[in-house]
UniProtKB/Swiss-Prot annotation:
Pathway: Cofactor metabolism; pyridoxal 5'-phosphate salvage; pyridoxal 5'-phosphate from pyridoxal: step 1/1. Substrate binds at residues 12, 47-48, 225. Its EC number is 2.7.1.35. It catalyses: pyridoxal + ATP = pyridoxal 5'-phosphate + ADP + H(+). It comes from Pseudomonas savastanoi pv. phaseolicola (strain 1448A / Race 6). The lineage of its organism: Bacteria, Pseudomonadati, Pseudomonadota, Gammaproteobacteria, Pseudomonadales. This is Pyridoxal kinase PdxY. Pyridoxal kinase involved in the salvage pathway of pyridoxal 5'-phosphate (PLP). Catalyzes the phosphorylation of pyridoxal to PLP.
Length: 288
């Protein structure tokens, strides 16, 4: 019997709705990954609503919880770490301490850093120290980085002028340490208005993927968290990078189709669960 992979997901959590771990955990489980959720914040709902309440996990609790897993002899079974939204650079450094501990227990363990800073339509939502930490420290340890366009712009200190420029910016991030960079949402002058575009960049090659852009009265939150989680999960399940990239684009599109059909603001993950596991659509990544 094939072993089920285990993934430590260090992200935010909302009681109502879907963002951070609340957007990623169930889909990752649904496609066959054992997820260990470590919630960096617990909020009533995501912060695009007019109000929310909740608490942030103290940074020192992150390595302490990981040591608790080590104490019961399970840390070596962790195949990957996924990190998302950071409340502070201190929280980020605590995560890197945990990643180092896990890689010591399992040298084959992977680390995907989703450098959450915001959304092109919503602006930056983190302090400058977090952006600096992600670029200067997290990128060096990450196997994979999955920025959106705003985050890639922040790392580059400029906006792109073309698709080729986006590719150059992703390659500059790749040079800081990751094995692969996935740009989850491209935005550049001349991009087709009816398309949603992504990039996958490695040292050897690059791929571009386009799918239809779906319209919503309010853009659902958690799409990036879902994207990063599914991409890492498919790699753990044996996909190569391009196959994981294509599967992720299709599965996320299926969720958005279901969400749109329901007229929902929150992602319809439960209703779309079979479409996540077995996407009906397929989008081909084109090598650049």
């Amino acid at each position: 019997m094939k072993r089920t992979p285990h993934l430590l997901a260090i992200q935010s959590h909302v009681v109502f709705g879907h963002a951070g771990n609340s957007a990623a955990v169930f889909p990752m489980q649904r496609i066959g990954v054992n997820v260990w959720p470590l919630n960096t914040v617990q909020f009533s709902n995501h912060t695009q609503y007019k109000q929310w309440t909740g608490e942030v996990l103290a940074p020192q609790q992150i390595p302490a919880l990981i040591e608790g897993i080590a104490a019961i002899g399970e840390l070596g079974n962790c195949d990957a770490v996924l990190s998302g939204y950071l409340g502070s650079a201190a929280q980020g450094r605590a995560i890197l301490t945990g990643v180092a501990r896990i890689k010591a227990a399992n040298p084959k363990a992977l680390y995907l850093c989703d450098p959450v800073m915001g959304h092109p339509e919503k602006g930056c939502i983190v302090a400058p120290e977090v952006s600096d930490f992600l670029l200067q420290e997290a990128a060096a340890m990450a196997d994979f980085m999955c920025p959106n366009q705003l985050e890639l712009d922040s790392f580059s200190g400029r906006k792109p002028e073309s698709l080729a420029d986006c590719l150059a910016m992703a390659r500059a991030l790749l040079a800081r340490g990751p094995k692969a960079v996935v740009v989850k949402h491209l935005d550049y002058p001349g991009k087709a208005a009816d398309g949603f575009e992504m990039l996958l960049v490695t040292a050897e090659a690059s791929w571009h993927l386009r799918r239809p852009l779906l319209a919503f009265p309010r853009q659902p939150v958690g799409v990036g968290d879902l994207t990063s989680g599914l991409f890492l999960s498919r790699i753990l399940l044996g996909d190569d990078l391009v196959a994981a990239f294509e599967f992720t684009a299709a599965a996320v599109h299926e969720v958005l189709l279901e969400t749109q059909a329901c007229g929902s603001y929150e992602l319809e993950l439960v209703r779309a669960q079979d479409r996540i596991a077995h996407p009906r659509v397929k989008f081909d990544a084109v090598r650049l």
